[in-house]
Swiss-Prot record:
Gene name linked to the record: rihC
Organism: Salmonella typhimurium (strain LT2 / SGSC1412 / ATCC 700720)
Xref: HAMAP family: Nucleosid_hydro_RihC (MF_01432)
Class of the enzyme per the UniProt entry, highest EC level: hydrolase
Active site: 235
EC annotation from Swiss-Prot or TrEMBL: 3.2.-.-
Gene3D superfamilies: Ribonucleoside hydrolase-like
InterPro entries assigned: Inosine/uridine_hydrolase_dom, IUNH, Nucleosid_hydro_RihC_nonspecif, Ribo_hydro-like
Protein name in UniProt: Non-specific ribonucleoside hydrolase RihC
Xref: Pfam families: IU_nuc_hydro (PF01156)
Amino acid sequence: MTASLHIILDTDPGIDDAAAIAAALFAPQLDLQLITTVAGNVSVEKTTRNALQLLHFWNSDIPLAQGAATPLLRPLRDAAYVHGESGMEGYDFVDHQRQPLAKPAFIAIRDVLMNAPEPMTLVAIGPLTNIALLLMHYPECACNIRRLVLMGGSAGRGNFTPNAEFNIAVDPEAAALVFRSGLEIVMCGLDVTNQAMLSPDFLNKLPALNRTGKMLHSLFNHYRSGSMRTGVRMHDLCAIAWLVRPELFTLQSCFVAVETQGQYTAGTTVVDIEGRLGQPANAQVALALDVDGFRQWVAEVFAYAP
């Protein structure tokens, strides 16, 4: 199968990011042209190290650029309590000499976009700081972005504060800018990602699959979004799944705003499902997932990996 969708992946590895990167690399429908890192689950130095370790593990020559170390206006609040202090606890990766590109992520994204023969798809599975910086410094790049597919937000409850999902809550100002940008946005938030559970039976079969299955199984043993006994949630993998199998998702066009001021609600995505605010839709919001179909696709895409 010839890869038909050219993508750039912005990520903050992160254990479930490792699964998403595997899918982005090995799904035959996708052509991953650049990886960029951002501070989120852990510091940007750690997310960059983790991404480089994964690329070395897979012997991949995909270029990688390090991105923002802090949110636009706030100090970083990370998720080491979910992913471990390193961000990818549980597997001993071998040493390597790989380094990121010399230029920052938002410039690397700009360069790839402006040199592409046609608009490309951005996939953001961490805080939206790098995407906001791109739009702030190079607004002309928007014409070269086919769409932005993101993992973030929620139409209901949060997983970082009572109402806010982690990726949006880490940098709500960046998220607000992105949702106001006019980009075509597909939002895969907690409404679907909490459904994207890999069962214990599925997880127990991973080590026999290949080297990648063994590595991911080791990481998932240390992942605190679920457990090996009850199943683990593949939040970030949903964004990649939508690219390849959009029919697995139920989407609705909605107006989405990001709260930046509230004492208790900063980082909340206000998803106007019923159109009560009278604002035009600015996102396609995923609200339901075919879980069995998702698990089948995950098994297929992991089998493509070495």
